[in-house]
Curated annotation (Swiss-Prot):
It comes from the Bacteria. Monomer. Its EC number is 2.5.1.75. GO terms for molecular function: ATP binding; tRNA dimethylallyltransferase activity. This is tRNA dimethylallyltransferase. GO terms for biological process: tRNA modification. Keywords: ATP-binding, Magnesium, Nucleotide-binding, Transferase, tRNA processing. Catalyzes the transfer of a dimethylallyl group onto the adenine at position 37 in tRNAs that read codons beginning with uridine, leading to the formation of N6-(dimethylallyl)adenosine (i(6)A). The lineage of its organism: Bacteria, Bacillati, Mycoplasmatota, Mollicutes, Acholeplasmatales. It comes from Phytoplasma mali (strain AT). Belongs to the IPP transferase family. It is an enzyme of class 2 (transferase).
């Protein structure tokens, strides 16, 4: 089977720096696996890698869509698999576990675009209460379904599927890999992670996080703002909360998401856990990948 390497972990764990180093060492290419970074304009708030930071390493699925365009997990699965087939050694880098697993395992996803009608043609944007209702319904009626509750389009799609002849969890998801996968999970103590998150957030504000959110709101009023960081800044701009409250919410939700993220990867994929603060981080990950590739056509 084709060998694929995954570099994942929470925000502020150093995925970008490590992936650039490893992709250079093994002559690989990087496939963005962060669902937000697929979209243009969400740069500061998603800590999107800059062109200069890419250091001539080929990156795929970055800045692919406008903020108000629909790009589903089905689209990612299709595009990612196509890239994998054409790349010598693909590195999937990001923290969107559902996206990563959909591309690497034999998930059968449908190409349904009905949610785009709800969001664009009708000019309808569901509010928080609507989202919470649909999430409760999905969990009650299809408790085995793994879905991204932070993405409203996917919540709506899963909710609409509740009325189909077969539950989505029963008909679409399987758990067999279609590639030979090595997953490196960058782990970090929660207190150190929180300090990093706070530091990064302050840096984002200095870089213009508020101005970026305001610009997206003005140019794409029907864009997805159900994203940690952008959602809270939007509330601040609407004068529903103050800046201190916005920052506290962003930090709290980021930490909660990181906790759930780790649990998800531990339960859903076989991972090699590496401590971010290990002084030999790059040496160890290099050796793990070298052993993984031993005997393959990459040597």
């Amino acid at each position: 089977m084709k060998k694929v390497i995954v570099i994942t972990g929470p925000t502020s764990s150093g995925k970008t720096d490590l992936s650039i180093y490893l992709a250079k060492k093994f002559d690989g290419e990087i496939i963005n696996s962060d669902s937000v970074q697929i979209y243009k304009k969400y740069n500061i708030g998603s800590a999107k890698i800059t062109f200069a930071e890419q250091k001539s390493i080929k990156h795929h699925l970055l800045d692919l869509k406008e903020p108000d365009e629909v790009y589903t997990i089905y689209d990612f699965q299709r595009d990612c698999r196509k890239i994998i087939s054409n790349v010598r050694l693909p590195f999937l880098v990001g923290g969107s576990g559902l996206y990563i697993k959909s591309a690497l395992f034999n998930y059968e996803l449908s190409n349904k675009k009905n949610t785009s009608i709800i969001y664009k043609n009708d000019k309808k944007v569901y509010d928080v209460d609507d989202m919470e209702f649909m999430i409760r319904e999905i969990r009650q009626k299809d408790p085995k379904l793994v879905f991204d509750k932070y993405n409203p389009r996917r919540v709506v799609s899963a909710y609409l599927d509740l009325n189909s002849d077969k539950l989505r969890s029963q008909k679409k998801y399987k758990n067999n890999p279609i590639y030979d996968i090595l997953t490196i999970y960058l782990d970090i103590d929660k207190n150190i992670l929180q300090a990093r998150v706070i530091e990064r957030l302050e840096k984002m504000f200095k870089m213009g996080f508020i101005e970026e959110t305001k610009q997206i709101l003005q140019e794409y009023p029907y864009a997805n703002f159900n994203i940690i960081g952008y959602r809270e800044i939007k509330l601040f701009l609407e004068k529903k909360i103050n800046l201190t409250e916005a920052k506290k919410l962003i930090i709290s939700k980021t930490m909660n998401y990181a906790k759930k993220q780790k649990t998800w990867f531990k339960n859903q994929m076989k991972i090699n856990v590496i401590n971010v603060l290990d002084s030999k981080l790059k040496i160890k990950t290099f050796q793990i990948i070298k052993n993984f590739l031993k005997g393959a056509v990459y040597d």
